[in-house]
Every structure is written in C-alpha cells, then in structure tokens.
Amino acid sequence: MYRPFLEHLQQKLQSSFDLQSLTIPAGLDYRISERGRESTTIRSWCYTCSELRKIRYTYIDGGEHAQVFNSVIYPAHRYDLPLLGIDLLAFGKKKNLIVLDFQPLFRDKAYLARYIEPMRILRERYGDVAQDVEMKFYDANQYFSKYLLFARTDAETVAGRVFTAYCDYLDLYWQLLASAAPLGDAQDIRRIVKAQKDYDQYSADRDPASGLFSSYFGHEWAERFLYEFLFEDAVPLAVGQPGR
C-alpha cells in the first residue's frame, strides 16, 4: 500500500542530493519473519549527503496483514531545521494510520515561526484528511508540531488525498532546507548536536513500534534495531541509568 510513498521519497532524494550510502549494522538491513499466517519482511535503507546527515527509511511488508513505511530525516548539524518524520501504517484492510510532521528541535517562538508556521497552509489544505484526535504516542509538546498531519483513514483516501498531502509536505520541507542559512558558530552547532541526540533518546525510550518489531522479529533483534539503527545516538535505559 505504501510502496508509492517510498518510491516517491527515493526519487526525490536521488534527483535532489548527492547521496552516499551509510552502512547499516549487520543483520539489521533485512530480515524475514515466519511468525503469523504469512511471512513478513523488513528492509531498511540509510544515506547521507552534505545537507542531510542521516536519511533512514524502513518498509515492513506483511501482505494484507501489515504494511508499514517509516522514515526520519536528520539535517546536517549546521542546520537547525526540524527533522522530517513519516509514519504510515496499515493493519488489515481498514486500519490505516498516517503521521507526517516536521519535528521541531526547539520550542521558542522565532523557531516555530520560521519552520513550523509554514506548515499551516498544508494543514488547512488537507483539513478534510487530518484529524484532531488523542495521539497516544505523539506528545505535541515534545518533538511534534501543532500542524502535523495525523489521520486514521481508508485505503482509497491513502492512495489519493493522503499521497497528495505527502508530496506537498515533502516539497515544503525541501524548500525550507534550500532556504536555510548554515550555522557558523561552534556553540550553535553543538546545540544542534545535543538536540538531535536528545530526540533519539526521547524517541527510543518511547517508540510505539518497538512492540511491533518484537512481535515479528523477536525482542533481541528489535532492541538492536532500535538502538543501533533507528535511534543510534540513544543509550539503552539499562546502560544510561546506573543501578537499574
């Protein structure tokens, strides 16, 4: 269901940036699970370029039972842009969950006006798709914006209206990146480094997909995937908190 979304992202990245592959730790780039009624595969890609220090995306194909496309794009540390976050999930034929967002690293008014306010027009344009629902796993006060596109919808809407919204969100993100002024001060850059590390730690500690990975591929593999690939700058709680 979400293959066109993956392919569109790949095409945009390849045509716009000088991509270099980043090594994914052994055994984490591809895996097959025979649990359940049919096999499920997970495959990941990871790249870098001068403007974007880490581009990662993952596709889970469980046939009619599960289709998941997840991506996070981290700007280079000399840019203070939000991260681009994509979560598209389908379980069965009727359960489709969509989350598209520019995930802010900071919450001050100037930052939000510069990077988040431009999203308003898209959120309003796709108000027929977006929903104001309780987001159990998405804290609007931490790394999520008030203009994120969050929706539970049907397959027809995903293929039509949601895909159009997705393309527009990506286009806006590329525009913000193209117009962003690189940081020159070492202290400012260190602030970005810390903010991106904090994002990884926050996300790894709360990632709602951890249980999904464990159910298909086992707990040990899921923990490696979480801390060695998805959020590699995070420290596992057992390591980061002595005495636990």
UniProtKB/Swiss-Prot annotation:
EC annotation from Swiss-Prot or TrEMBL: 1.3.7.2
GO biological process, one term: phytochromobilin biosynthetic process
NCBIfam families membership: PRK13247.1
HAMAP family, A to Z: PebA (MF_00792)
Family of the protein in this entry: Belongs to the HY2 family.
Annotated organism of origin: Gloeobacter violaceus (strain ATCC 29082 / PCC 7421)
Molecular functions per Gene Ontology: 15,16-dihydrobiliverdin:ferredoxin oxidoreductase activity; cobalt ion binding
Keyword line: Oxidoreductase
Protein name as catalogued: 15,16-dihydrobiliverdin:ferredoxin oxidoreductase
Enzyme class: oxidoreductase
InterPro entries: DiHydbiliverdin_OxRdtase, Ferredoxin-dep_bilin_Rdtase
Coiled coil: none
Function: Catalyzes the two-electron reduction of biliverdin IX-alpha at the C15 methine bridge.
Domain of life (superkingdom): Bacteria
Gene that encodes the chain: pebA
Annotated catalysed reactions: 15,16-dihydrobiliverdin + oxidized 2[4Fe-4S]-[ferredoxin] = biliverdin IXalpha + reduced 2[4Fe-4S]-[ferredoxin] + 2 H(+)
